[in-house]
């Protein structure tokens, strides 16, 4: 049984450990873009065990974060309590999440490449809809190079990112940073080793 055949069961099993499988520190690309965060609020999309949502709260933002795994949300709540941060956690998949139109000043999606192309287009549209004009969008994902490294991600070509995809999906944004690169990452036990990466930071017009 693969993660794509039974995703909720797969992820609940992966998160059923006291260990934070993606670590407790924020994603390195997200951290590098801190200067571009807008004051106010943030939405962390498919935030897993909460490392990025908690870090966003530590930057003084009012944070909503969701993930469909109950085990992940429980661990995220514990992480926030330990770091003395307030985050509004929602146990929900992206289709059922209560997306609020033009609500957030920042929307962040880190390694959420479970979505096939048609589903991804709809998810990107929801992220765009929820971001205020002038707000910041930050995305980190894997490129086709990741298929040879096999150090994380879905391992499916159709799920990989590239720069033309991002420029087309967010054509109404001003691109602040868009790069594809290879780097050594060390995010818990699940993301470790040389990786093919894409980072996008953009401002909604």
PLM features: residue spans?
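A short, conserved alpha-helix within the catalytic core of class I
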Residues: 114-127
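Conserved beta-strand signature within the Rossmann-like core of class I S-adenosyl-L-methionine
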Residues: 134-142
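Conserved SAM-binding strand-loop segment of SAM-dependent methyltransferases
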Residues: 83-96
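Conserved class I S-adenosyl-L-methionine
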Residues: 1-37, 39-48
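Conserved SAM/SAH-binding beta-strand->alpha-helix loop
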Residues: 69-71
């Amino acid at each position: 049984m693969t993660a794509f055949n039974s995703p909720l069961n797969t992820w609940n099993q992966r998160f059923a450990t006291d260990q934070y499988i993606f670590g407790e520190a924020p994603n390195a690309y997200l951290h590098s873009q801190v200067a571009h965060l807008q004051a106010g609020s943030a939405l962390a999309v498919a935030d897993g065990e909460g490392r990025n949502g908690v870090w966003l709260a530590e930057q003084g933002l009012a944070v909503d974060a969701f993930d469909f795994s109950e085990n992940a949300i429980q661990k995220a709540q514990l992480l926030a309590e330990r770091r003395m941060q307030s985050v509004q956690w929602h146990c929900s998949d992206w289709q059922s999440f209560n997306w609020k139109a033009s609500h957030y000043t920042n929307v962040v999606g880190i390694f959420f490449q479970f979505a096939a192309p048609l589903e991804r287009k709809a998810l990107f549209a929801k992220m765009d809809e929820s971001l205020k004009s002038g707000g910041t969008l930050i995305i980190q994902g894997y490129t086709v190079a990741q298929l040879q490294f096999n150090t994380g991600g879905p391992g499916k070509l159709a799920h990989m990112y590239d720069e033309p995809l991002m420029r087309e999906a967010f054509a109404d944004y001003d691109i602040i940073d868009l790069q594809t690169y290879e780097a050594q990452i060390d995010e818990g036990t699940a993301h470790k080793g040389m990786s093919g990466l894409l980072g996008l930071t953009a401002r909604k017009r």
